[in-house]
Amino acid sequence: MTADQLQSIIRAGLACEHLTVEGDGRHWYATIVSAEFEGKRLLARQRLVYATLGDRIKTDEVHALSMKTHTPAEWANALSE
């Protein structure tokens, strides 16, 4: 799997205002900004992202995904710091 493929999968299941994915083909790091994270705690946000991946995690197609999840307001604050 490539970073572009993983981005496409996440975007297909989650409305993202910003998304970056980097990695080596098995271990991935993503920064995801979505209004769908509003009012949700970290674990709920991660579950939303994992839901977009479906069985790709279980089948080891995506071995590991580290992520930072932000609402648009949180992202704007992070950029202004």
Predicted regions and their residues:
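Short edge beta-strands and adjacent turn/loop segments
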Residues: 13-29
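Residue-level signature for short turns and capping positions that connect secondary-structure elements
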Residues: 26, 35-37, 72
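Histidine-centered active-site/metal-ligand motif
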Residues: 27, 46, 63
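A short interface-forming secondary-structure element
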Residues: 32-46
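C-terminal structural segments of small proteins and small subunits
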Residues: 51-81
